[in-house]
């Protein structure tokens, strides 16, 4: 959605969409979206709970990874603000119209307004959505950088916290995310420069991934060699195995994310060029917003310890009920065994008595 302030050169670029639909249909779709987001939030928060309860990775890695999952809440706040404008719960005082293109320079497809009055909350929601997207992009690169540092400082990284590493990486990634998000909203940069962080970070992350994989596989091969001359401490061996475990998990998550981004990218392009009806924008938009479903489930089921805890926690009432049923069945079996033993004893003594009479 592009907003143009009349009698000025000011433009506002928001990653929000509005559709020309009856209010009843908007209400029905919004109820579905809210229900899906509530369930998605439950899955996400449960996944974060499991990751924090069963910490299998270094504290610095968790410091960077958990916020990447939790930042979805910021995205959903922006989504809820958009829904409020669609349903006219927040009314700017004029019709917003239909806006289903990602970006355009066509004046007929932009929203012409006298000023930003009444749109402040929508602009804030749009900023939250842009900020979430770029926080994930730079956050992934920050995680890859932290794992590179862990591989370089293999001698004592496991035994020393070095909490300043994730703090510095977080500050840098957030400064970049906030700066680019503000620049996009004010259209200080166009679509090409807006895509540039993706173009730069993607190959950089792949190169870092290959470096970490090669380094740690070489170290593991050396550790497993009985004729090695180099001495590896227990913490160093654990660090190598942790890096490789993180890579395996990261590979699966990257495949899911690439698949997700590809579908969303094709969908947004199809909407922009009018290849599909505008109504399909709901499907593409919600497909993007509900990304924690595949990502969290992939993470939880990739590691056995997380998977077991996740299964126990996802339906606590059902699990408690099953535990009670299992306990009752066990007690009944024990009682039946005791009764059977008692009957057999009575029969034995009765037969013994009869044999003596």
Swiss-Prot record:
Family: Belongs to the nematode receptor-like protein sre family.
Recorded topology in the membrane: Multi-pass membrane protein
Signal sequence residues: none
Compartments where located: Membrane
Protein name: Serpentine receptor class epsilon-30
Keywords: Membrane, Transmembrane, Transmembrane helix
Transmembrane intervals: 31-51, 61-81, 121-141, 165-185, 192-212, 253-273, 283-303
Primary location class: membrane
Gene Ontology cellular-component terms listed: membrane
GO biological process, one term: sensory perception of chemical stimulus
Coiled-coil residue windows: none
UniProt keyword Aminoacyl-tRNA synthetase present: no
Family matches, as InterPro entries: 7TM_GPCR_serpentine_rcpt_Sre
